[in-house]
């Protein structure tokens, strides 16, 4: 009589009911070893015993003589267990569970029997305190689900006791909490399902949230609902006010006692990785006396939002400004970040470069609006091609179809995924983006999938479908490392007679995947093998990385060309600048040799005929990597204006020509010399020279001729 529960005899009964053909198929399939498939050799020996091939079965069992379960199978088959009465090995329940897993994969037994077998194995190892229990539980979770490895007897529903909570005990050394601490669970009832009676005394309606005053809250991002009520400036009054009901989740945070400022609790040697530290000087003053909480109370992250326009729920501590808000040590054993806004009393500053030796290096801060995390990264200087390529998902297969066959494509994708081929896609659902070119969508579908499935129906005969076939075939021929990636698929809704002659001729050299076939599921398993899918995904990642690096290289080449052009422009500017300096030097020498007015202007600013030169500094020479810098100027060249250049610069205003105190008395003309001649004025009292209309008035003694004329 067949056994009802999972056991070795019941496994033999299942094999006996499978039939001769199925046993022959299992014999050849199990003969090839598969990595990570425990129990395959034992099942192969049992199949040989059921087929009557005792010689081969004896050889297989002899190879497994180190396995106690295999020796038990040999003794049971030989019929010697009744005389010797051997002790059952401890691993027999685990081996039976693995056998039932293989039988369930071959559809020879329901999955429920496999689950029962694993439950029995877990129960057996738990009763013996076997050290391999964790390994068995992991295997059971992977094969049967997460609920199979637990103990059903230990699961209880939650229960809420609406009675009075145990009174709080004030601990002198512990932290204080508002509004009421939770000391212990000794007097509590067992858990049951959550329920609410709606009474005013319900626990859920009286919960309040208190703010931890041990640190100024530095948020990485502001709350979308508005500023927090817990993070405003401290009010003049510290009297608690009623809480607006229904605006915050129940959460408890600790307040330190007033005497804890001088003696903070001991800090841990190393904070948890990735959590901010809080400085020990962030303390609170003027706190009201509240019941003390147990030492195990911990500050947890709470994102506070404004629920109503009511008054503040709790008194706020006075926060003193700290030296570095970005690196502050908390006074509680666990440092946890709280999302909130920074107090106005704190001043933002750059992060400190040093950290304690006992703490691990903190992770790089995420980009935010706070000054402490505003750092420039090298990736901001280049296009994020690698990041954009990683956003594109890789599919194990994509179904190309006609527009009228969208429902068939969705059904085929769901069926293939049900047969064990995950991450499938259809052309209409995953790649046809509205507004994008049809050919670009087709190319994306081909580039980001391991296998291309052509849905052969009577509608698959238009020009667009033929183009899809041609593109898929060319991709099959040209893509390296991806042979045999095009699969013609004949669904249940179609037949070979309904296909067009063009499509049939193009795909005549490829083997079809026919859904009408009786071994369709087996063909799917042989086609979409996991190692083939993993290899093609690895090849796809290499292609995406290569493409991203190529785009970055092109971007860098463009920037390099721009830098070379700018360098050439600056070199031309430098040449013109040096030429201008040489010309100005010649002009200054020529003008200086012919100056005759004893004005107080500098030598470099004096010109004949009342002319003037601006005395401003030359424009700053722009810097660029690899561009030569201009030579230093002499003191007399400080007022020279630059020549026209590729980039014009603003020049300072010219200074007025200095005024002479008195015009010199006219004298006989000196001997003329070739070149520029000085200006000589006779018989004039008022003289106006230059562009600034300065007047010189000479009222000294008159010439003898003038005196003679006046006497007459």
UniProtKB/Swiss-Prot annotation:
Mutagenesis or variant effect for residue 465 to N: No effect on IFNB induction
BP-aspect Gene Ontology terms: apoptotic signaling pathway; B cell proliferation; cellular response to lipopolysaccharide; cellular response to oxidised low-density lipoprotein particle stimulus; defense response to virus; inflammatory response; innate immune response; lipopolysaccharide-mediated signaling pathway
Region listing for Disordered, in residue ranges: 216-316, 336-384, 620-677
Post-translational events: Phosphorylated by TBK1. Following activation, phosphorylated by TBK1 at Ser-210 in the pLxIS motif. The phosphorylated pLxIS motif constitutes an IRF3-binding motif, leading to recruitment of the transcription factor IRF3 to induce type-I interferons and other cytokines. Polyubiquitinated at Lys-229 by TRIM38 with 'Lys-48'-linked chains, leading to proteasomal degradation. Polyubiquitinated with 'Lys-6'- and 'Lys-33'-linked chains in a TRIM8-dependent manner; ubiquitination disrupts the interaction with TBK1 and subsequent interferon production.
Mutagenesis / variant outcome for changing residue 60 to C: Inhibition of IFNB induction
Pfam families: RHIM, TRIF-NTD
Protein name as annotated: TIR domain-containing adapter molecule 1
Native source species: Homo sapiens
């Amino acid at each position: 009589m067949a056994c009802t529960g999972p056991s070795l005899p019941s496994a033999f009964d299942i094999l006996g009911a499978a039939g001769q053909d199925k046993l022959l198929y299992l014999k050849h399939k199990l003969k090839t070893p598969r990595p990570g498939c425990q129990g395959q050799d034992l099942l192969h020996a049992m199949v040989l015993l059921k087929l009557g091939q005792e010689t081969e079965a004896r050889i297989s069992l002899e190879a497994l003589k180190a396995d106690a379960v295999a020796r038990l199978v040999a003794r049971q088959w030989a019929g010697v267990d009744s005389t010797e009465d051997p002790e059952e090995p401890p691993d027999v329940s685990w081996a039976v569970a693995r056998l039932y897993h293989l039988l369930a994969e071959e559809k020879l037994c329901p999955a429920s029997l496999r689950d029962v077998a694993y439950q029995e194995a877990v129960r057996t190892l738990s009763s013996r305190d076997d050290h391999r229990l964790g390994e068995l539980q992991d295997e059971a979770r992977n094969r049967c689900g997460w609920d199979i490895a637990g103990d059903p007897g230990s699961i209880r529903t939650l229960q809420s006791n609406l009675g009075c909570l145990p009174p709080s005990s004030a601990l002198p050394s512990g932290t204080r909490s508002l509004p009421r601490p939770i000391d212990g669970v000794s007097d509590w009832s067992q858990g049951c399902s959550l329920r609410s009676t709606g009474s005013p005394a319900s626990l859920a309606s009286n919960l309040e949230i208190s703010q931890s005053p041990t640190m100024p809250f530095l948020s990485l991002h502001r709350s979308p609902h508005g500023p927090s009520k817990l993070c405003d400036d401290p009010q003049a009054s510290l009297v608690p006010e009623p809480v607006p009901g229904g605006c915050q989740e129940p959460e408890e945070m600790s307040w330190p006692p007033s005497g804890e400022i001088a003696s903070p609790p001991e800090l841990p040697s190393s904070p948890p990785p990735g959590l901010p530290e809080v400085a020990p000087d962030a303390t609170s003053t003027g706190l009201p006396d509240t019941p003390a909480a147990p030492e195990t109370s911990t500050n947890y992250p709470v994102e506070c939002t404004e629920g109503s326009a009511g008054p503040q729920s709790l008194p706020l501590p006075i926060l003193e400004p700290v030296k570095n808000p970005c690196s502050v040590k908390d006074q509680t054993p666990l440092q946890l970040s709280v999302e909130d806004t920074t107090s106005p009393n704190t001043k933002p500053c750059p992060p400190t470069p040093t950290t304690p030796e006992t703490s691990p290096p903190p992770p790089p801060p995420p980009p935010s609006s706070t000054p402490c995390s505003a750092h420039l990264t090298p990736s901001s200087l280049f296009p994020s091609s690698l990041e954009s390529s990683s956003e594109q998902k890789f599919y194990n297969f994509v179904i190309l179809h006609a527009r009228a066959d969208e429902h068939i494509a969705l059904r085929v994708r769901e069926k293939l995924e049900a047969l064990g081929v995950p991450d499938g896609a259809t052309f209409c659902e995953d790649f046809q983006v509205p507004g994008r070119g049809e050919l670009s969508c087709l190319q994306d579908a081909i580039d980001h999938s391991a296998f291309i499935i052509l849905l052969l129906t009577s509608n698959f005969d238009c020009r667009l479908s033929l183009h899809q076939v041609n593109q898929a075939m060319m991709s099959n021929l040209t893509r390296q490392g991806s042979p045999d990636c095009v699969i013609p698929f004949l669904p249940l809704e179609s037949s070979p007679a309904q296909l067009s002659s063009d499509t049939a001729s193009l795909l005549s050299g490829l083997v079809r995947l026919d859904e009408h076939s009786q071994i369709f599921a087996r063909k799917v398993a042989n086609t979409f093998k996991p190692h083939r899918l993993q290899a093609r995904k690895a090849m796809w990642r290499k292609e995406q990385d290569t493409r991203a690096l190529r785009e970055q290289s092109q971007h860098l080449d463009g920037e390099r060309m721009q830098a070379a052009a700018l360098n050439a422009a600056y070199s031309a500017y430098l040449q013109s600048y040096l030429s201008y300096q040489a010309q100005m030097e010649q002009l200054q020498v020529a003008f200086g040799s012919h100056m005759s007015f004893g004005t107080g202007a500098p030598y470099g600013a004096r010109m004949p005929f009342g002319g003037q030169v601006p005395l401003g500094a030359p424009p700053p020479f722009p810097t660029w990597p690899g561009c030569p810098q201009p030579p230093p100027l002499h003191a007399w060249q400080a007022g020279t204006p630059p020549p026209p250049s590729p980039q014009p610069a603003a020049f300072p205003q010219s200074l007025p020509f200095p005024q002479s105190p008195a015009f010199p008395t006219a004298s006989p003309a000196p001997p003329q010399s070739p070149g520029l001649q000085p200006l000589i004025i006779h018989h004039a009292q008022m003289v106006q020279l230059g562009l600034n209309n300065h007047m010189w008035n000479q009222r000294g003694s008159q010439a003898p001729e003038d005196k003679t004329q006046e006497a007459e």
